[in-house]
Regions:
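Active-site loop immediately N-terminal to the catalytic Tyr-X3-Lys motif
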Residues: 97, 144-150, 208, 226
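Alpha-helical segment proximal to the catalytic Tyr-Lys
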Residues: 124, 167-172, 229
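Substrate-binding pocket helix/loop in short-chain dehydrogenase/reductase
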Residues: 95-96, 103-105, 201
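Active-site helix of classical SDR
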Residues: 119, 155, 163
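Short C-terminal tail/terminal secondary-structure segment
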Residues: 144, 232-250
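C-terminal helical subdomain
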Residues: 178, 199-227, 231, 238-240
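Residue(s) in the substrate-gating loop at a strand-loop-helix junction
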Residues: 139
Length: 250
């Protein structure tokens, strides 16, 4: 894709799942890539799998001081950050009536406050430089109701509206978009769903399957490229047709 060669890319939650696939895709496009992830074992694994990474960083995205320190390290390593993939997130499958205050606070701290901390830190850097692209991982959960993920759903709705507001305020210097995947076969998804549950979900998706992380990564690469230079403020659904009919067959 045009314009990705030599871009400097930071991917949060970049050591597994969608983040790892996205890091790999940008490397294929000739970009310099740093990944940020809390999971030490996952960081070691991604370093082995992607030896051309510019660096791996450890930070809790819900801690502003750690975010600022990690971002400064990314700038030091790569000489700047042109593209942020704001992807770090967690989910907990539980009934609404069973959500504890601690669980609620944890999911919001990572999925919304953490997204804000990373986005604001990157935006200040990009605004000063005069250009940049911020792409955030939302979810179809942010636009549709799903049981057992009330806290996660609320955070992803927040990411969608945060993205729109950022795009309006940061234009014309910085483009901001979000990708809202549907069901994606990631380690996080695997940990929460049995094979029977996965098959049941597949029957309700028009394309009859989960997305691959690489398919989400491809959209991130396009949106960061010069081919998408007129795209900002948009949320791109990548869900196999799931939201077209509101998962009508369920």
């Amino acid at each position: 894709m045009r314009g990705l060669e030599d871009k400097r890319v930071l991917v949060t939650g970049g050591a597994s799942g969608i983040g790892a696939a996205t890091a790999a895709r940008f490397l294929e496009e000739g970009s310099a890539v740093c990944v940020l992830d809390r999971d030490a074992a996952a960081r070691q694994r991604i370093q082995r799998e992607l030896p051309n990474l510019a660096g791996t960083l450890d930070a809790d995205v819900s801690n502003l001081q750690q975010v600022e320190s990690a971002f400064a390290n990314a700038v030091r390593i790569m000489g700047g950050v042109d593209v942020l993939i704001n992807n770090a997130g967690i989910s907990i499958r539980h009934k609404f009536l069973d959500i504890t205050p601690e669980e609620w606070a944890k999911v919001l701290a990572v999925n919304l406050t953490g997204v804000f901390f990373v986005a604001q830190t990157a935006a200040r850097h990009m605004w000063q430089r005069g250009s940049g692209v911020i792409l955030q991982t939302a979810s179809t959960n942010g636009v549709m109701g799903y049981p057992f993920y009330a806290d996660y759903n609320a955070t992803k709705a927040g990411v969608i509206e945060l993205t729109k507001s950022m795009a309006l305020e940061l234009a014309p210097k910085v483009r901001v978009c979000a990708v809202a995947p549907g069901y994606v076969l990631t380690p996080m998804q695997r940990a929460e769903y049995t094979d029977e549950m996965l098959e049941e979900v597949n029957r309700k998706i028009p394309l009859r399957r989960h997305a691959k992380p690489e398919e989400i990564a491809a959209l991130f690469a396009y949106l960061a490229s010069d081919d998408a230079a007129y795209a900002t403020g948009h949320v791109f659904m990548l869900d196999g047709g799931e939201t077209a009919g509101g998962l009508a067959s369920r």
